[in-house]
A protein has these predicted regions:
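Charged, terminal alpha-helix-loop-beta segments
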Residues: 1-152
Length: 152
């Protein structure tokens, strides 16, 4: 598990910014999406992406990492909100709807990038204020590329 830390650069000086809880999950999502490439190394593609009538959900953020792997980012303010289960649900949806994601990449970035999507490295990033020991253990047991990130 990793923490997201922010720093302010002034000339040759670097200062870590103090962390604080966000009031709303949407605030956290907005800040990460606005800086996704810098914070996560992921190119932002879509926010609140609808999963259709069958799944009836919305993926918080979709992106593509520097290796061409699809990335789902799910956000929660608190640790007890089943972010991992929800993320796995959307990960399953994404792997079942590769053509739809490929079309999104084609529209946002271009055909060449869409043709070289690396599905074997599909990632799920769960961002929350904290995770419990059961979350951390569960992620180790699941044979998927899942990252837990705490914000402060």
């Amino acid at each position: 598990m990793s923490d997201i830390k922010l720093f302010q650069l002034k000339g040759n000086s670097v200062t870590e910014l103090a962390g604080h809880a966000v009031k709303l999950e949407k605030d956290l999502q907005f800040h990460v999406e606005s800086n996704m490439e810098v914070l996560l190394g992921v190119r932002f593609l879509a926010t609140e992406y609808g999963t259709g009538k069958t799944h009836k959900g919305r993926v918080d953020s979709l992106g593509l990492d520097e290796n061409g792997c699809p990335v789902i980012v799910e956000y929660k303010r608190h640790s007890n909100e089943n972010v991992i289960n929800q993320g796995l649900f959307y990960l399953d949806w994404l792997l079942d709807h590769q053509a739809e994601f490929k079309l999104l990449v084609m529209e946002q970035i271009g055909r060449e990038v869409a043709e070289s999507i690396e599905w074997g490295g599909t990632r799920l990033i769960c961002i929350a204020s904290d995770f419990n020991k059961y979350d951390e253990h569960a992620v180790q047991q699941i044979n998927r590329n899942i990252e837990l990130m705490r914000y402060r």
